[in-house]
Amino acid sequence: KWEGVKASQYLEYEKSGSRDIMEIPNNRNSTAFGRLLMAELAEGKGRFLTDIMDGVFYFCEQTTWAESAHLVAFQKSKRSIPDYRTDVLELRQDGLAQMLSWTYYFLHDQLDKIDPIISMRLRHELQKRELDPFINRTDFWWMAWKESPTVFVNNWNPWCNANALLCYMLLENDRDKLAKAVYKSMVSVDRYLNYVKADGACEEGATYWGHAFGKLFDYLSELQMITGGKVSLFNNKLVKDMGEFVAKSYIGNGYAVNFADASAHVSNYMALVYRCGKALGSREMMDMAVDCFKERPEAVTSVWLDTYKQIEAMKVLKEMSQAKGDYKADAFTWYPQTEFCYMRNAEAFFAGKGGYNDESHNHNDIGSFVLYYNNTPIMIDAGVGTYTRQTFSSERYTIWTMQGNYHNIPMINGVPE
């Protein structure tokens, strides 16, 4: 059953600030579709084809694939209800476009046997919603098209570029148009690499690494493929340092350093960490991934709107299950530009943060720290609650989880930081 999203559910973002009211049914639809697609690709008997066809038709009939919170930012109307006149490139739109591009690539012949209009319509929507806006527009902030010393770039850049490039690789048969898209993505991602601090830390937090470096890794893998290996950055020191950040931020027992909006629990991307470790020649990353995988085998099964990651994960599952992980982290790690410091011994782990507020997903504090003993949290950062309209607005620092006095900074005579 494909769940419709009502106009009132989009508008609820403006009314109460809720994102979940439209995101939850949307995510249930895309999750179900992703499972149907993977099941059909695995079995290949056409058993799931009717449901896939219904899903394709449903998505094509949607006015937008974007989320209400992002429509406000990108639409000229600045409203959260979809405007049929505007195609928006944002995280969910690009992710769904990637999944539907795989659907067209693998299944358009089978869908044509039912009715050619299904795959014809899908190809039209992918061109209109993803390929054309990517190549024709430069006004999306995440592209960082107008480079300057103060340009802000975060995980959106590699995330959206990786999905867009993959869509072009799967759909575009004109070599000149494909080359133009490849070059444009390279210029944009180069701005992201210029923005990242020289120490390679992810200022957005360890679990956001999967969206930041994780998508950068996907992008660089795609770029290496489409250029026949002529463009490869896997021997670049900054890229390796960015990759190893996730391993150095791992505490143990499923916990990771959770500064900024990151979670305190390692995310479901251990196959990604393992693949990155192999590409970068990092034994530390591979061992960390294997140890986490054996502790929590489910850590590779759920990837939001990312068919590419799921396919690549399945290629290494057997290898990971047979590998012997022996993760040993450094006793001391210091990121001088990002101002993260990690110290550990046999029993204790301490992480301290300096930095400043004008960082992606940052909180309003003079600094923060977490302390673990025998992989058990003792002094914690409460993290972040459910994202709402307030989370990424001028009201952000009115939310208690974003304030220093609810981290571990004391109040002096009743005066907060």
Cite the ranges covered by each PLM segment.
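Solvent-exposed loop and edge beta-strand segments that line ligand/cofactor-binding
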Residues: 17-30, 41, 77-93, 136-158, ...
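Short, flexible active-site-proximal loops enriched in glycine and acidic residues
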Residues: 62-74
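Non-membrane alpha-helical segments in proteins
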Residues: 27-42, 54-58, 94-105
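Carbohydrate-active enzyme catalytic cores, enriched for enzymes
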Residues: 213-379
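Structural helix-adjacent loops and short alpha-helical linkers that scaffold large soluble proteins
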Residues: 40-53, 103-127, 168-186, 223-239, ...
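Active-site rim segments in enzyme catalytic domains, especially the processed small/beta chain
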Residues: 367-417
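Active-site lining segments of carbohydrate-active enzymes
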Residues: 79-207, 218, 309-312, 317-326
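Low-complexity, Ser/Thr/Pro/Gly-enriched N-terminal "stalk/linker" regions
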Residues: 1-14
